[in-house]
């Protein structure tokens, strides 16, 4: 038996099929994965993502420390509530993790992947020398993500009336501290929505209120197909500590300016850019298969520039055909995959397929 969130019994009561996910007993679905996927694309669904690790960083050097630790620049977080997506790199310029960092009244809050929790904490502590900072994991905090076109309206049905205007007024990648809740306009589905971070002792009450309001529970199976349609990476699949962010469609998570800011992995990234400019660094692209078949992680690819591999692949419930993320030689123009002995052409597109329920690639 693995670790369980405070909502484990609620998942069982809702008919969830439980699977192991990085040492956690998590609901993969409550019935039909496709129906859950479509629920988020057309209405509203709630995900229990309390398995993710919350780490609070405080102290007088917290900002200075995070400017060194992370590839993106927390100096951009110029007001409480703002959020930033960042890579955390090792000294080789490879991805130790991807995470979201929030500016809080007490300092900063990081939400990192559960599978990398131990590694991330060790790395963070290892790099505190010379900084007056405190690092505190918050295992008693729950995270519920509510996403879909109806999500904001549904959330406003279950919170205090005097909080609704603040929630409706939230900009993307902004959050607000409302009593015991921190509520942010962030997510992993390509739909609008919010994420609640709050004491796990209150999780059952909020879960019940959301379900009573008509929000449906969604498992990690649909969460994966939703994030894939949105072209969002999954750590350990689309990138890991052997992967440059430049080979994982993550350059937007790196702040090269101001030039005098040093951060872990920066010198190596300069070398990666030179490799890319010389055509020697692969890139992460989207693939579209409009004929029958399903693209799967690990399938090998052949392009006009060499070989590649699928890092994430699935049937797309929204598009009604298979899509994938793949790492292939840069500037490839054509691509083929072996599907059960049949060499099949797939189309190369930008790694972003669906946003707000609509196809976004050409």
Task: Explain the meaning of each model-derived region.
Residues 1-22, 27-28, 104-362:
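Conserved, structured C-terminal
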Residues 51, 61-66, 84, 95-97, ...:
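Generic hydrophobic, aliphatic-rich segments that mediate packing or membrane embedding
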Residues 1-89, 94:
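Acidic, proline/glycine-enriched N-terminal capping motif
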Residues 48, 98, 195:
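Acidic active-site catalytic centers that drive phospho-/nucleotidyl reactions
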Residues 36-40, 91, 98, 177-184:
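Membrane-targeting and insertion segments and their boundary/processing signals
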Residues 76-79, 87-94, 99-104, 126-127, ...:
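Short, charge-rich binding segments
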């Amino acid at each position: 038996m693995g670790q369980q969130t405070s909502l484990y019994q609620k998942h069982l009561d809702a008919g969830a099929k439980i699977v192991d996910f990085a040492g956690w007993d998590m609901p993969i679905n409550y019935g039909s994965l496709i129906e859950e996927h479509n629920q988020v694309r057309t209405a509203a669904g709630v995900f229990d993502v309390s398995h993710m690790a919350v780490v609070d960083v405080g102290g007088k050097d917290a900002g200075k420390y995070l400017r060194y630790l992370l590839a993106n620049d927390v100096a951009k977080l110029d007001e409480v509530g703002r959020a930033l997506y960042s890579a955390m790199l090792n000294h080789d310029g490879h991805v130790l993790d991807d995470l979201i960092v929030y500016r809080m009244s007490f300092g900063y809050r990081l939400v990192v992947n559960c599978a990398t929790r131990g590694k991330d904490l060790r790395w963070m502590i290892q790099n505190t020398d010379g900084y007056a900072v405190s690092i505190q994991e918050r295992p008693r905090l729950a995270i519920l993500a509510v996403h879909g076109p109806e999500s904001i309206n549904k959330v406003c049905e279950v919170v205090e009336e005097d909080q609704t205007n603040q929630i409706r007024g939230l900009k993307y990648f902004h959050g607000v501290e409302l009593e015991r809740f921190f509520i942010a306009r962030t997510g992993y589905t390509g739909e609008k929505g919010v994420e609640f971070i709050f004491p796990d002792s209150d999780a059952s009450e909020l879960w019940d209120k959301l379900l009573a309001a008509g929000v449906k529970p969604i498992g990690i199976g649909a969460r994966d197909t939703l994030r894939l349609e949105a072209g969002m990476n999954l750590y350990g699949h689309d990138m890991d500590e052997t992967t440059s962010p430049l080979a994982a469609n993550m350059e937007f998570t790196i702040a090269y300016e101001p030039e005098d800011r040093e951060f872990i992995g920066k010198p190596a990234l300069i070398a990666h850019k030179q490799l890319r400019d010389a055509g020697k660094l692969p890139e992460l692209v989207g693939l579209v298969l409009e004929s029958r078949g399903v693209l799967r992680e690990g399938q090998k690819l052949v392009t006009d520039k060499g070989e590649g591999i699928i890092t994430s692949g699935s049937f797309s419930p929204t598009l009604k055909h298979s899509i994938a993320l793949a790492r292939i030689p840069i500037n490839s123009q054509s691509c083929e995959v072996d599907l059960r002995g049949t060499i099949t052409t797939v189309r190369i597109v930008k790694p972003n397929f669906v946003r707000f329920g609509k196809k976004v690639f050409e």
